[in-house]
Amino acid sequence: MVCADIEGGISIFRFTNVLLLIDGSEATTLDEMQQTLRAIWAAEQPVPWRSGTMEAMARFLRSLRGRQDWRGNVGKRAWVAAKYVLRCLTLLRGHLDFLAQIEGEPALLAFRRRDPRMLERHLHRYLTRGWRRRQRLDAIRWHYHHALAAMPAAVFRAVYVEGIARLGLLMLKDGGHLELGLRPPIVFGCEGELCIQIGDDSGNPLYRVVVTVIDADTLAIGCIQGPDGGDARETVRALTRNLHGLRPRCLMLALARALARHWGLSRLLAVGNAAHPLRNPRRRFVADYDAYWEEQHGRETGDGWYELPLHPQRKTEADIPSQHRSAFRKREAVRIEAERLLSDAMNAMPRRHRQHEAHAVEPDFGPLLHGICAEAS
């Protein structure tokens, strides 16, 4: 197994050198590159444990295509591509397995076309500053393994391919509505893989919580974020009044808890201030997550996370002064309706994973190389 990893790394490194030569030298032709790749492929055939190397190389090559997240001129994109390759080599076997997972699921492959950054989120800061690349990759792979099995196919596609799954409307005090939806992570996002969002009548996002299923038992919260801008504070106040006094971030936390319970997960973690991936010692970190998690009876775990109760103790109507009971009932009605909309969206029969068997054939690198060179020109 170790030999296979080493040989796979050497093959991809040799292939990357060819790719960089083509980028830097006008004298190198596509035909010459294809001949080089075929020679590598032919040289690897006699050894049985190398049989999957060229297929992995082909996947790796495809991961360099359609990279609209690599911006700038040709030189800058080539430099970003080179860094991507070198980072991949530090986690070669895991990264190649991830590429195989993506190409083995049509819905994931469609999401990769929409957001190519998903190919390398684990190679950058992600979810918590305390994780290494292997932990980031394991969490991301587990999330999509779980989401494909637990989310109805139509909902998964709406979220990750079309960009939003609209779950329904919540009635506000002034007669208006909030739209509850699910979204994929933002471009260059580092706080998680699934966004639960409320927005206004016009579709503008107001509040969101970003979550990730990081293992068989755990849902992790990477952020709870409200509106920004100069009038953000007043927007939150107005929204709280329209929710009969229910704070929007409490509604978002309730939805994260509801999702974890619906999916049968037993732990809810939330990242603290010090471990947040966007924390910068040279810049003030605006959100005070620690205070909010402690307010919500979170317990610090000692590794940058807070563990939150999945079933918090809630006040009953008897605990509320009589003059405030009407507003309390309305707040609870909004929360319960939001949780119902989320659960109803997830209630269809889970989609089972399909097993794909790969057959070793000599790959045709021509169309792939033409595509890459066309994008780089």
Question: Model features per residue range: what roles?
Answer:
Residues A238-T240, H244-R257:
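Conserved acetyl-CoA-binding loop-helix of GNAT-fold acetyltransferases
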Residues I221-C223:
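Short, contiguous, well-structured surface segments enriched in hydrophobic/aromatic residues
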Residues F15-I22, T29-E193, Q197-Y207, V213-D215, ...:
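Terminal substrate-recognition subdomain of acyl/acetyltransferases
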